[in-house]
UniProtKB/Swiss-Prot annotation:
Keyword Cytoplasm tagged: yes
InterPro entries noted in UniProt: rRNA_ssu_MeTfrase_G, SAM-dependent_MTases_sf
EC code(s) of this entry: 2.1.1.-
Gene name in the database record: rsmG
GO cellular component terms attached to this protein's record: cytosol
Location relative to the cell: Cytoplasm
Record protein name field: Ribosomal RNA small subunit methyltransferase G
Family statement: Belongs to the methyltransferase superfamily. RNA methyltransferase RsmG family.
Main location class: cytoplasm
Keywords: Cytoplasm, Methyltransferase, rRNA processing, S-adenosyl-L-methionine, Transferase
First-tier enzyme category under EC: transferase
Origin species: Synechococcus sp. (strain JA-3-3Ab)
Matches recorded under Pfam families: GidB (PF02527)
């Protein structure tokens, strides 16, 4: 991907919106971070010309549904001061066009994120974005989560895993938990959330060495859409059989109630 010249559309003028982040996130981007986030918008819009990266193109919708939403989930980890104090080794599973991993990397420059996706084209785009935004502490990798989770160098090596708009929660858990250290945490981004889904997830977590710590419900600031974020913790080593081979987690999800 070449630099947009001119960009697909001008970066959104978001200065008036940053103040709301202090209320919702307990954090505001610095001027260089604002510039990176605005440049991210321009790069995604330019990339959208040649591949289907996102249907969200309105500047305000992009700010809310990609930038704000990506960072809102991190609040489950504690106050922003506490979050920024940790040198996270994180992974964004199913990153797509780079969300939530790129906003998280911009907001947490002390962290080192791996952005994982099975699509070679999307990862090529994300690699170019990381280069143009000078995010040298992040890397983008084209690989399936099931294979990455069985790689001896990657398995059990992450402090934090993020999964947004990837699959059902129990499937995301099978992708995330094997990659975490014991004590590591995963944040699953959901829309609506039901008690039935929670019970399925808990059954899956009992097999994976994980625990559901917290579910937080909130509404988005502009469109007032309902969101839920789930905080998982790895409390025991994940059995070596997980994640199962590619495709099986989606075809045969863990935690299904066999009595039904």
């Amino acid at each position: 991907m070449k630099k947009a010249d001119p960009p697909a559309s001008e970066p959104p003028e978001l200065e008036a919106l940053w103040s709301s982040w202090l209320v919702d996130l307990g954090w505001q981007p610095s001027e260089p971070q604002q510039q990176q986030l605005q440049q991210l918008y321009s790069l995604v819009m330019a990339g959208n010309r040649t591949q289907n990266l996102t249907r969200i193109t309105d500047p305000i919708d992009f700010w809310e549904k990609h930038l704000w939403d990506s960072l809102r989930g991190l609040r489950l980890l504690g106050s922003w001061d506490e979050i920024q104090a940790q040198p996270w080794r994180g992974i964004d599973i199913g990153t797509g066009a780079g969300f939530p991993g790129i906003p998280a990397q911009i907001a947490l420059p002390q962290a080192h994120f791996t952005l994982l996706d099975s699509s070679q084209r999307k990862i090529a785009f994300v690699q170019e974005v990381l280069q143009q935004l000078s995010l040298a502490q992040a890397r983008a990798v084209a690989q399936r989560a099931e294979i990455w989770g069985q790689d001896p160098q990657e398995r059990g090596s992450y402090d934090l895993a993020l999964a947004r708009a990837v699959a059902a929660a129990e499937i995301c858990a099978e992708y995330c938990l094997p990659l975490l250290k014991v004590g590591g945490r995963a944040i699953l981004y959901r829309g609506h959330w039901t008690e039935a889904e929670a019970q399925t997830l808990k059954r899956a977590l009992s097999l994976l060495g994980g625990k559901l710590i917290h579910v937080e419900a909130f509404t988005t600031p502009h469109s007032h859409g309902m969101r839920h974020c789930l905080l998982l913790e790895k409390v025991a080593p994940t059995p070596a059989c997980y994640p199962r081979p590619p495709g099986i987690p989606k075809r045969q999800p863990l935690g299904q109630d066999k009595r039904r």
